Amino acid sequence: MVKYISILGSTGSIGTSALDVVSAHPEHFKIVGLTANYNIELLEQQIKMFQPRIVSVATKDLADTLRMHISANTKITYGTDGLIAVATHPDSNLVLSSVVGVSGLLPTIEALKAKKDIAIANKETLVAAGHIVTELAKQNGCRLIPVDSEHSAIFQCLNGENNKEIDKLIVTASGGAFRDKTREEMKTLQAKDALKHPNWLMGAKLTIDSATLMNKGFEVMEARWLFDIPYEKINVMIHKESIIHSLVEFIDGSVMAQLGAPDMRMPIQYAFHYPTRLPSSYEKLNLLEIGSLHFEKPDLEKFPCLQYAYECGKIGGTTPAVLNAANEIANALFLKNEIAFFDIEKTIYKTVEAHHNVKDPSLDAILEADQWARQYANQLLIKKS
């Protein structure tokens, strides 16, 4: 069966990898819609190659510029309404949500209402509104298929298994760019240092989140919703080689793991063609060449953001959305070299501490908490500077 796919975030790291997968298997995958933020040069190339029915960009000006360069066969939209139009296009049956940040939340929700299966790479959607998204998926008979390598690994390990027989999920982490640095050494490190990820090629925001281990915290929160497992049963393990993507330990002591080369095209292809597999020409894993694998506990004193994520996830309500929003603000300013690395964790902590949590929040309450946290975090950092 041919999958008709819309990609939210087609010019980012996940989006371009996804289009590589589509190019490799044109008999199985067709592109219906694409969205970009500001990179219309790359989007224009993608439009010419994949001939989508609809695309969306960030602003009306960018949409007008794009119209001058492409044929009238592709509808061009913009803004949040444009994202939603792509996500809900009637010709698609699978939506890859790979935009960065909480901007992926509304289009994902609308896609579920339109009964689309979701290949989910946008962590923040489940972090901020996991209870809403998972319930909508159930109500509409939609599948949430994970794309992150860690969640794809768990998803594959649990195929055919009974959730009641799970003892724990073990999410692996490379440790990020600063894994071998001391707290003292990290004080003066800048964005250019954090962007040198040891194993994966990722977007800038995600690479900074990896350096703070906030990314791993988000993945723990995501796993809680994807697999309906309490936080007490989700562990993190540092695995520097990024060969074992995650593990599941069962109540009888058996441990199942999924291994593969660190190439995002593999979990993307698995998600796109689920429930069956396709052959690929990507690098195959050779354990004899690797020789040995290493594991250690994460240092929560060195990387407190991981602990914050656990705590906020357990609190629930609007607190996870606040955690995410404060992180987005601080991350963006660190990327501009306007704040120090440790200001990220300080901003997150202070913003979460100041928040008045709303239990079992509506979507509106989550969005209000998100906006409040952005304003509060910005004010904290303005005062600091």
Curated annotation (Swiss-Prot):
Q: Which residues bind NADPH?
A: T11, G12, S13, I14, N39, N122, E124, G203
Which of UniProt's keywords are assigned here?
Isoprene biosynthesis, Manganese, Metal-binding, NADP, Oxidoreductase
Which residues make up the binding site for Mn(2+)? D148, E150, E219
Q: In which pathway does it act?
A: Isoprenoid biosynthesis; isopentenyl diphosphate biosynthesis via DXP pathway; isopentenyl diphosphate from 1-deoxy-D-xylulose 5-phosphate: step 1/6
A GO molecular-function annotation: NADPH binding
Q: Report which reactions are catalysed by this protein.
A: 2-C-methyl-D-erythritol 4-phosphate + NADP(+) = 1-deoxy-D-xylulose 5-phosphate + NADPH + H(+)
What are the names of the required cofactors?
Mg(2+); Mn(2+)
Report the EC number(s), separated by commas if there are several.
Answer: 1.1.1.267
Q: Where does 1-deoxy-D-xylulose 5-phosphate bind?
A: K123, S149, E150, S174, H197, S210, N215, K216, E219
Entry's Gene Ontology BP terms: isopentenyl diphosphate biosynthetic process, methylerythritol 4-phosphate pathway involved in terpenoid biosynthetic process
| Signal sequence bounds | none
Instruction: Give the UniProt family note.
Output: Belongs to the DXR family.
As for what it does, the entry says:
Catalyzes the NADPH-dependent rearrangement and reduction of 1-deoxy-D-xylulose-5-phosphate (DXP) to 2-C-methyl-D-erythritol 4-phosphate (MEP).
Under what name is this protein listed? 1-deoxy-D-xylulose 5-phosphate reductoisomerase 1
